[in-house]
Swiss-Prot record:
Pathway: Carbohydrate acid metabolism; D-glucarate degradation; 2,5-dioxopentanoate from D-glucarate: step 2/2
An example Gene Ontology biological process: D-glucarate catabolic process
Domain of life: Bacteria
Family: Belongs to the DapA family.
Record keyword Lyase present: yes
Protein name: Probable 5-dehydro-4-deoxyglucarate dehydratase
Length: 303
């Protein structure tokens, strides 16, 4: 799949990022991961991101990363394209990127570099180096320390033909509008704020109709119902799902830092697809919070 073909796929539909399965000892559980991917693939996501932020990329050893990407690519070979999360320092990100390409990933999600403070010129140089290390398509994720503006993205687009996507995790509307207007159809644009459904209608109005869904991991039918309501501008259906599910969900998620991942793993367990515990420094939901989520999921009915 060439970068432009990937760009076309990412320009439509719902995207998601499976959690990574760990066993009771905290080691990667490929059998559970295969079962998860086989469950989720038929629900109709346009692409899946393996070892992304919700897939705990930041906690994976290099050998585990290879196992996760290979398992995802092999399992979904005939069903849905797999993009691999990559990140860390420039040299680390290049090693991950080249390994993902070797294993058959169709594209990459370039996560923000970790902790190091840097100018945005330096961040742009980091992005360029990773893009030029591979031939597959790359989506850059503006979030946290990565805050590339329209000027820098325009330069990167000229230098890196395989940079085909922009994912926004900042929520800076002025910046999003300037990037969308300046870059036009050069990129595929993805909404990437945590619990992106809450912002989906607003982002669609800005020309960003595609987003990645975390809750697809455990209420895939509800996630697709919401996406379809957004797509057809069914404001009543959107409002009802936000009131009935997403706002109560946020009340639980926002109780503790890092719960954006932890709550998804809890939901997967409730749904019958236990992915094991999160790895430190993240923490799992309390028993009370787990029961609150279970009751909320029960209201959504069979998936």
């Amino acid at each position: 799949m060439n970068p432009q073909e990937l760009k076309s796929i990412l320009s439509h539909g719902l995207l998601s990022f499976p959690v990574t399965d760990f066993n009771a000892q905290g080691d990667f559980n490929p059998a559970g991961y295969i079962k998860r991917l086989e469950w989720l693939a038929p629900y109709g996501a346009s692409a899946l991101f393996a070892a992304g932020g919700t897939g705990e990329f930041f906690s994976l050893a290099a050998s585990e990363y290879s196992q996760v990407i290979k398992t995802a690519v092999d399992t979904c070979a005939t069903s849905v394209p797999i993009l691999a999360g990559v990140g860390g320092s420039t040299r680390q990100a290049i090693e991950y990127a080249q390994e993902a390409e070797r294993l058959g990933a169709k594209g990459l999600l370039l996560l923000p570099h970790y902790l190091t403070e840097a100018s945005q010129d330096g961040v742009a140089a980091h992005v360029e180096a990773v893009c030029k290390s591979v031939n597959i398509g790359v989506v850059v994720y503006n979030r946290n320390v990565c805050r590339l503006n329209a000027d820098l993205l325009e330069k990167l687009a000229e230098r890196c033909p395989n940079l085909i996507g922009y994912k926004d995790g900042l929520g800076d509307i002025e910046l999003m509008v300037s990037i969308r207007r300046r870059l036009g159809e050069r990129f595929s644009y993805l909404g990437g704020l945590p619990t992106a459904e809450v912002y989906a209608a607003a982002y669609k109005a800005l020309g960003v109709p595609v987003y990645s869904s975390a809750v697809f991991n455990f209420v895939p039918k509800t996630a697709m119902d919401f996406y379809n309501a957004i797509a057809r501008d069914d404001h009543a259906a959107v409002a009802k799902l936000i009131d009935d599910f997403f706002l109560p969900y946020l009340d639980i998620r926002n109780r503790k830092a890092g719960y954006a991942v932890s709550i998804v793993k809890a939901g997967a367990r409730i749904a019958g697809y236990d992915a094991g515990p999160v790895r430190t420094p993240l923490t799992d939901l309390t028993a009370e919070e787990y029961e609150m989520l279970a009751a909320l999921m029960d209201k959504m009915g069979p998936q």
